[in-house]
From Swiss-Prot:
Coiled coil location: none
Cofactor dependency: Mg(2+)
InterPro entries xref list: G_ENGB_dom, GTP-bd, GTP-bd_ribosome_bio_YsxC, P-loop_NTPase, Small_GTP-bd
Organism lineage string: Bacteria, Bacillati, Bacillota, Bacilli, Bacillales
Protein name: Probable GTP-binding protein EngB
């Protein structure tokens, strides 16, 4: 997909702040610092629309990015960052649950994981959380460029096994650094962003 226009519309903390234009939405979930912002930036060919940070826990709101005036990427707070207070984590959890449970325009969730490592218990819980709400899920295994080519399939198979992925769910190895997996990601997303 060629992206001609991309902008952040709002950083929301409750549903009364969500955009009201009824465009389809794709949520992006994953651990803190796993590469959700880099994934967005690579897909839209921008360096800094979604701000990246070496400091985990940067995203603390639901960030709505309108793409080509036709759909939204919604970056949700990362999970698994120990230095965030329990109270703050609970607040994020309620905010995300409200979004996943009530948002009619939410079409699918992209779960971003680090392909170099086995999915964490938090990744497994998020996958199960998404499945509980009966939402389509696409797993993106980031940092593909950091794994030697002869070990990639082993890492992919292991991630699928640890997540106990449904056969119908898609797993896409991805590198924000070199763009590998970008076309496959757009292809998978395209079925959910048509009105």
């Amino acid at each position: 997909m060629k992206v001609n226009h991309a902008e952040i519309v709002i950083s929301a903390v409750s549903k009364k702040q969500y955009p009201e234009d009824q465009l389809p939405e794709i949520a992006l979930a994953g651990r803190s610092n796993v590469g959700k912002s880099s994934f967005i930036n690579r897909l839209i060919n921008r360096k800094n629309l979604a701000r990246t940070s070496s400091k985990p826990g940067k995203t603390q709101t639901l960030n709505f990015y309108r793409i080509n005036e036709s759909f939204y990427f919604v970056d949700v707070p990362g999970y698994g960052y120990a230095k965030v207070s329990k109270k703050e984590r609970e607040k994020w959890g309620r905010m995300m649950e409200e979004y996943f449970q009530t948002r009619d325009t939410l079409r699918a969730v992209v779960l971003v994981t680090d392909l170099r490592h086995d999915p964490t218990q938090d990744d497994i819980q998020m996958y199960d959380f998404i499945k509980y709400f009966d939402l389509p899920v696409i797993i993106i295994g980031t940092k593909l460029d950091k794994i030697t080519k002869n070990k990639r399939q082993k890492h992919i198979n292991r991630a699928k096994q640890v997540l106990e992925m449904d056969e119908t769910d898609l797993f896409i190895p991805f590198s924000a650094e070199i763009g590998e997996g970008k076309d496959e990601a757009w292809s998978a997303l395209s079925r959910y962003i048509k009105r």
